[in-house]
Amino acid sequence: MKYRDLRDFIHGLEQRGELRRVTQPVSPVLEMTELCDRVLRAGGPALLFDAPAGHRFPVLGNLFGTPRRVALGMGVDADDEAALASLRDIGRLLSALKEPDPPKRLKDAGKLLSLAKAVWDMGPKTVSAPPCQEIVWEGDDVDLHKLPIQTCWPGDAGPLLTWGLTVTRGPNKTRQNLGIYRQQLIGRNKLIMRWLAHRGGALDFREFALKHPGQPYPVAVVLGADPATMLGAVTPVPDSLSEYQFAGLLRGARTELAKCVTPGVDALQVPARAEIVLEGFIHPQQGAPAPAPEGAPPRPAAGAAAGYEHALEGPYGDHTGYYNEQEWFPVFTVERITMRRDAIYHSTYTGKPPDEPAVLGVALNEVFVPLLQKQFAEITDFYLPPEGCSYRMAIVQMKKSYAGHAKRVMFGVWSFLRQFMYTKFIVVVDEDVNVRDWKEVIWAITTRVDPARDTVLVENTPIDYLDFASPVAGLGSKMGLDATNKWPGETQREWGRPIEMDAAVKARVDRLWTEIGLS
């Protein structure tokens, strides 16, 4: 089943019993978080709050709260286990797009041409009179407080926009970038754009500030896009392919786009059937900035981007299960808000796993496996345990071929995808260890690891800014554990031989099992 827009997806989920409408008044301040958190932990449905307290816009929460709903959003209709297997097919598609195999036969060349044609055919198309612009707020009508923006946790600094797809373009790029960055509400038309330095939006902004210093930087934020576009924004799409094209491949139909209506932002294109779109700019700082609060970190001082309006963001509860520190980020000033009639506001929360990002991580884990295997054929499985805050720990299963092989794989994973830049811990195991079973992983660590020989420590590496355990914000260490069987050259001792029951005895006990009445 392919979904043209969010409403189509909501209808499909409701038909499958995967969405529940909440008609009772529920407050966006804390109550929605608590309700969504309980439902997600129970493996329950997406929630559509028809009557959010104090607001007229319905709120959609817990949309991707199970792997099955993630797969449904990518066009795969199956239960959780089958859905995860199907997501590997999407990973194989991405792998082929990222690095196509040279054709060995005429048949292979035909497949490669078919794939290239499919990508070409799924280029987005621009439409006129798009649904996302049925209603336009401008001037004094622009008031973000009218939207039911959630305050997720008691210690949060204020309401937080969480599921916005931020659309940017760098001055030297033809393709647009889609990224999901949380945004703190600080005024009727102002949000703090929390994009980390390595993310696409931040890179586009810095390049623009260098090339056009003192000029406003155009930005659009999309709320309530179709599921394929939302998931395309969190998938490791090759740089040669736009997220809109990839969404078209998932959907089986070209992504319909609309030009933004605000002068200066109209070079950006947004999904034509999105629920709500915020259009505006990051403006240069006018005059001297207000003094920083006592004890606050210093304002950005280096680089062209430092000359733009910034504000102190946070603290907010995050996917680590803790409140993060305050930091300075650019201020996004909203000039216009466009929307569909009867628009739906899409939201989420982040907290100690499991949360929605953790579920997305479980699903995207299956997409990562073929990508890794394309680069490292020795990798036989890969797992990002959700308890590891989506990406901070990885368990790698491999077919080991020589001494030192596991360490090569560690460094390969750390450097392969941007998503693994912040992975703090990597454990490498042999093929006989199930990476999804902590009991087996712990057994491998405790029986196959010598702490001095098999631990790799790397200092002064990029680390998530939210990781307060690192000694310096954004810079910390990484640790790899080689929990594989050791080869000659790695040990001078005779390696242990695993205990295994005689096959004939196992077969006899299989026959006795039913006779004894144990089945």
Swiss-Prot record:
So where does Mn(2+) get bound?
A: N177, E243
Which biological pathway?
Cofactor biosynthesis; ubiquinone biosynthesis
* Cofactor binding notes: Binds 1 prenylated FMN per subunit.
Q: Which UniProt keywords apply?
A: Cell membrane, Decarboxylase, Flavoprotein, FMN, Lyase, Manganese, Membrane, Metal-binding, Ubiquinone biosynthesis
Enzyme Commission identifier(s): 4.1.1.98
Give the membrane topology, semicolon-separated if more than one: Peripheral membrane protein
Cell location: Cell membrane
Q: Where does prenylated FMN bind?
A: I180, Y181, R182, R194, W195, L196, R199, G200
List cellular component terms (GO).
Answer: cytosol; plasma membrane
Catalyzed reactions per annotation? a 4-hydroxy-3-(all-trans-polyprenyl)benzoate + H(+) = a 2-(all-trans-polyprenyl)phenol + CO2
Q: Name one GO biological process term.
A: ubiquinone biosynthetic process
> Per the database entry, which stretches of residues form a coiled coil?
none
> Mostly located where?
membrane
GO MF annotation: an example:
3-octaprenyl-4-hydroxybenzoate carboxy-lyase activity
Record keywords: Flavoprotein included? yes
Active-site residues?
D318
Q: What class of enzyme is it?
A: lyase
Q: Identify the cofactor(s).
A: prenylated FMN; Mn(2+)
Decide whether keyword Manganese is in the record.
yes
Subunit annotation: Homohexamer.
Family in the record: Belongs to the UbiD family.
Q: What does this protein do?
A: Catalyzes the decarboxylation of 3-octaprenyl-4-hydroxy benzoate to 2-octaprenylphenol, an intermediate step in ubiquinone biosynthesis.
Question: What is the recorded name of this protein?
Answer: 3-octaprenyl-4-hydroxybenzoate carboxy-lyase
